């Protein structure tokens, strides 16, 4: 129930991606990217809706061809979540999706072309009030920078980003955010640190091509956790070779662990040992599965014995401490007379957790209306 984070966010300007504020103290937005063929309109819409269901604030869609741009038009009309069009190589695609109501344009300095092409995109974005993301990637730096630095370095990623920041500055266009992604944690972290000292625009965080679900989640948590703990970052994407829905879940889990932004239940559970009075692992797994739909931020501790159980329960909204045959139940730190039969823990806990989630949601609603 410790709700306040000690982290002080880096000051930044604010932009809007659709109706989602980015920067200047706004909640850190969690986004993902579709991995369907964009021309498969039905599959892409279905995936976007699945992402929206688990809390995605923004969804990025690759638009590699003009056919994909035409598909994007239909997709945009069919979903509610703001969409970012991911544009590489052909700047004319950016102009086309701008006509179709895109909420943000992501361009890659390494392949979008010369300043004249960038100018065309910027003028279009200005006319239609569309923000831009300058998306630098260690795997696609400009050739002259690779010749200069020999390999991706923090200085190379920074120089690539600043070239295009300078172009936008000269054009008096300030509605943009920047990313300097790399697949190496230290390269990405140092690149973002350097960039954060140079500009005031919002920063989009990511460890690019992080890997599969397990390793990629760990790598992203380490890298983004370092930056977020320093107050750096205004929006993020977890890049996993996995179902994009998992990217959203991991993104919120990282923010939740730093108490920056919470969505859903924070389960505090012991790894279990021979002292456990019930099967902790199966209990937690089943509760996580059943309660995925709960969006209210709350802490639930599931501890298998009395060594740490009472202490964790004191700082949880709902706490369970393992006991012989029956386990102790806590509500907001207070031990209750009611005890739960260890053979029926999941059903009993689910009911209590859902009731507490509703109570907390109502409490927040009342607070909002009285302030």
UniProtKB/Swiss-Prot annotation:
GO terms for molecular function: 4 iron, 4 sulfur cluster binding; 4-hydroxy-3-methylbut-2-en-1-yl diphosphate synthase activity (ferredoxin); 4-hydroxy-3-methylbut-2-enyl-diphosphate synthase activity (flavodoxin); iron ion binding. Pathway: Isoprenoid biosynthesis; isopentenyl diphosphate biosynthesis via DXP pathway; isopentenyl diphosphate from 1-deoxy-D-xylulose 5-phosphate: step 5/6. It comes from the Bacteria. Keywords: 4Fe-4S, Iron, Iron-sulfur, Isoprene biosynthesis, Metal-binding, Oxidoreductase. [4Fe-4S] cluster binds at residues 270, 273, 305, 312. The keyword Ion transport does not apply. Its EC number is 1.17.7.3. Binds 1 [4Fe-4S] cluster. InterPro entries: Dihydropteroate_synth-like_sf, IspG_bac, IspG_bac-typ, NO2/SO3_Rdtase_4Fe4S_sf. Its cofactor is [4Fe-4S] cluster. Pfam families: GcpE (PF04551). It catalyses: (2E)-4-hydroxy-3-methylbut-2-enyl diphosphate + oxidized [flavodoxin] + H2O + 2 H(+) = 2-C-methyl-D-erythritol 2,4-cyclic diphosphate + reduced [flavodoxin]. GO terms for biological process: isopentenyl diphosphate biosynthetic process, methylerythritol 4-phosphate pathway; terpenoid biosynthetic process. Belongs to the IspG family. Converts 2C-methyl-D-erythritol 2,4-cyclodiphosphate (ME-2,4cPP) into 1-hydroxy-2-methyl-2-(E)-butenyl 4-diphosphate. NCBIfam families: ispG_gcpE, PRK00366.1. HAMAP family: IspG. This is 4-hydroxy-3-methylbut-2-en-1-yl diphosphate synthase (flavodoxin). It comes from Shewanella sp. (strain W3-18-1). The gene is ispG.
């Amino acid at each position: 129930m410790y709700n306040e984070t000690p982290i002080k966010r880096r000051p930044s300007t604010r932009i809007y991606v659709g109706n989602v504020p980015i920067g200047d103290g706004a909640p850190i937005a969690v986004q993902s990217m579709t991995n369907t063929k964009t021309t498969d309109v039905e599959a892409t819409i279905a995936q976007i809706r699945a992402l929206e269901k688990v809390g995605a604030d923004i969804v990025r869609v690759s638009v590699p061809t003009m056919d994909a741009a035409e598909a994007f038009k239909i997709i945009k009309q069919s979903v509610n979540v703001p969409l970012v069009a991911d544009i590489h190589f052909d700047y004319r695609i950016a102009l086309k999706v701008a006509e179709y109501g895109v909420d943000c344009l992501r361009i890659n300095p390494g392949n979008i072309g010369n300043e004249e092409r960038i100018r065309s995109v910027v003028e279009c974005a200005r006319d239609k009030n569309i923000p831009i993301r300058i998306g630098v990637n260690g795997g696609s730096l400009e050739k002259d920078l690779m010749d200069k630095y020999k390999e991706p370095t923090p200085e190379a990623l920074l120089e690539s980003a600043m070239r295009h920041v300078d172009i936008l500055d000269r054009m008096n266009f300030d509605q943009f955010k920047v990313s300097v992604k790399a697949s190496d944690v230290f390269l990405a972290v140092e690149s973002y640190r350097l960039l954060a000292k140079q500009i005031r625009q919002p920063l989009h965080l990511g460890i690019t091509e992080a890997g599969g679900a397990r390793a990629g989640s760990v790598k992203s948590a380490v890298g983004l956790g370092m930056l977020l703990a320093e107050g750096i970052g205004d929006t993020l994407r977890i890049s996993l070779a996995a179902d994009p829905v998992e990217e959203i879940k991991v993104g919120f889990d990282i923010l939740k662990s730093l108490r920056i932004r919470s969505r859903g239940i924070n389960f505090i559970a012991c790894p279990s040992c021979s002292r456990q009075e019930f099967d902790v692992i199966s209990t937690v797994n089943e509760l996580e599965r059943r309660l995925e739909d709960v969006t209210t931020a709350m802490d639930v501790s599931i501890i298998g014995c009395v060594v740490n159980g009472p202490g964790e329960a004191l700082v949880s909204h709902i706490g369970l401490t393992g006991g012989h045959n029956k386990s102790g139940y806590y509500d907001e730190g207070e031990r209750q007379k009611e005890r739960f039969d260890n053979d029926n823990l999941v059903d009993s806990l689910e009911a209590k957790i859902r009731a507490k989630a509703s109570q907390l949601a109502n409490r927040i609603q009342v607070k909002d209306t009285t302030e």
